[in-house]
């Protein structure tokens, strides 16, 4: 079995964001732990009329971004190696619950 890591994320100040990243290592030489994040989950906790900006975006290999329409209660499940970001908050407050499933390395 694996373990689950959970984090409550708050975007409360204008400009709060998360730069482009992956939730796990993709280069085998960087894999120093016995397990790593395999599956990522983001659950929206705030109605999208309560904030502007702070949108989750996925980045494709060609650099294009996908912005899923997100509202309170929506969940996004994706492989932890997928690049993504959260754009800067403009106004309001956004809360999300972020979870990662840890397991053995992909083969």
Located regions from the model:
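Catalytic core of non-heme Fe(II) oxygenases with the double-stranded beta-helix
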Residues: 1-107
């Amino acid at each position: 079995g694996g373990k689950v890591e959970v984090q409550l994320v708050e975007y409360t100040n204008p400009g709060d964001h998360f730069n482009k990243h992956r939730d796990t290592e993709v280069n085998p030489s960087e894999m120093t732990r016995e397990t790593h994040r395999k599956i990522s989950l983001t659950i929206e906790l705030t109605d999208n009329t309560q904030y502007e900006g702070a949108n989750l975006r996925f980045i494709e290999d060609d650099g294009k971004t996908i912005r899923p329409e997100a509202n309170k209660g929506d969940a996004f499940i994706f492989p932890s190696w997928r690049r993504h970001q959260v754009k800067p908050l403009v106004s309001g407050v956004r809360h999300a619950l972020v979870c990662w499933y840890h397991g053995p390395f992909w083969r």
